[in-house]
């Protein structure tokens, strides 16, 4: 299935309802929008709202991050995505885990919407609401947030 020249959706099985303009793709589903790829086994794509959503686990990948969750949605038009249940964002510099997270594949900003942990080699951040720029590693933490920074160890002088 193709939408314009930037969105391609593949799957082993496709059911399309012309009245509702909803495509249901099953097994080995791949949705590609420029540098963003969504992989799942069950995807519904609403052509009217330009929104794809999965509900049996999925993975969204861009140049910087890999996000997985039980349920999620992605809009190629707005580059916005929403993830729920067992959310994990893996970046070469850190891992963010959460129950609910929004993410923009264009500006690479994760919006924390529930209890979340961001863990890197020397830091552990807990927050229940805030913003985290995955490219600059700058955060704006709101509500209940805790930061633990480990001091790097230095060798003892001889």
Where are these regions (language model features)?
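Extended lipid/amphipathic-ligand handling interfaces
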Residues: 1, 10-18, 39-47, 68-76, ...
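Solvent-exposed loop/turn segments connecting transmembrane beta-strands
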Residues: 4-6, 33-37, 62-66, 91-95, ...
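A generic tandem-repeat structural signature
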Residues: 7-10, 15, 19-39, 44, ...
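A generic beta-sheet turn/junction motif
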Residues: 18-20, 33, 47-49, 62, ...
